[in-house]
């Protein structure tokens, strides 16, 4: 899938789930389940409840996403 097809949105981490999954509330109010991208996992970037994150969503399934950036 081409990178242009992904939808990037800002959100806040609501809770931490097992296997590096997170429940994220997007700015528009939707709640999605997201996992950490490979580069964030490789560089040991920690994500805690309440962190502001950027989530990539695919147009095919808007209930799942990938966390690609953690804001300070």
Curated annotation (Swiss-Prot):
PANTHER family: TRANSLATION INITIATION FACTOR IF-1, CHLOROPLASTIC. The gene is infA. InterPro entries: NA-bd_OB-fold, RNA-binding_domain_S1_IF1, S1_domain, TIF_IF1. One of the essential components for the initiation of protein synthesis. Binds in the vicinity of the A-site. Stabilizes the binding of IF-2 and IF-3 on the 30S subunit to which N-formylmethionyl-tRNA(fMet) subsequently binds. Helps modulate mRNA selection, yielding the 30S pre-initiation complex (PIC). Upon addition of the 50S ribosomal subunit, IF-1, IF-2 and IF-3 are released leaving the mature 70S translation initiation complex. Keywords: Cytoplasm, Initiation factor, Protein biosynthesis, RNA-binding, rRNA-binding. GO terms for molecular function: ribosome binding; rRNA binding; translation initiation factor activity. The keyword rRNA-binding applies. Residues 2-72 form the S1-like domain. Component of the 30S ribosomal translation pre-initiation complex which assembles on the 30S ribosome in the order IF-2 and IF-3, IF-1 and N-formylmethionyl-tRNA(fMet); mRNA recruitment can occur at any time during PIC assembly. HAMAP family: IF_1. Its main location: cytoplasm. The keyword Kinase does not apply. It is found in: Cytoplasm. This is Translation initiation factor IF-1. GO terms for cellular component: cytosol.
